[in-house]
């Protein structure tokens, strides 16, 4: 495994020897990396290598999985994300998540975006939050005249942008994306990718993707994970982490080169 400190001045997350277990089974081992602020970091690697497992550590949604536990160090803006006094709900407000398949609530477009601020009791102008969030998600012009319609009536690509708007409405610091385009057509995928590049001016974004072309197009940094058999258990590990152009053009690890050139995984 290679761990590499990068010449960046500001890090949102830093992990050190991070291990994730499901019950007694080790799922991912010894992950050490620094996530730079206001850049897009991509996690790539074969199925089962722990990309999504590590992603869920960053907003503590692994806490919701029975038997899951994290060992090692994970800091968010220099503070221990797993300290006893840290409220996981507050963490998830600051660190939003967009899932593999669009999952709008069975509510109006307006109520989908307003849901988070309402639940959190945020003292904001909801009309303004809804409009601003939809504009940032590049959806406003398509839905501004039908905000009362059900969010589930939108196309798949529109639904995913609605989910992004819903995440933005609670004013997060980080956006996690777990295969956000895997269920979308190429045109919708390109729109989401363009949106990500716009959003990185204000937000730190981490994306899990099996699409290496997507990782090379949108990300600034790339982490390559792989998997090894330990007995009968598949254990994920970080192999290499560097600038995206390095990972795709001149990686230092042969396993990385084999993967990005299509000879593995």
Curated annotation (Swiss-Prot):
GO cellular component, one term: plasma membrane
Membrane topology qualifier: Peripheral membrane protein
Signal peptide: none
Localization, UniProt: Cell inner membrane
Sequence ranges assigned to domain ABC transporter in this UniProt record: 13-260
Main location: membrane
Protein name: Phosphate import ATP-binding protein PstB 2
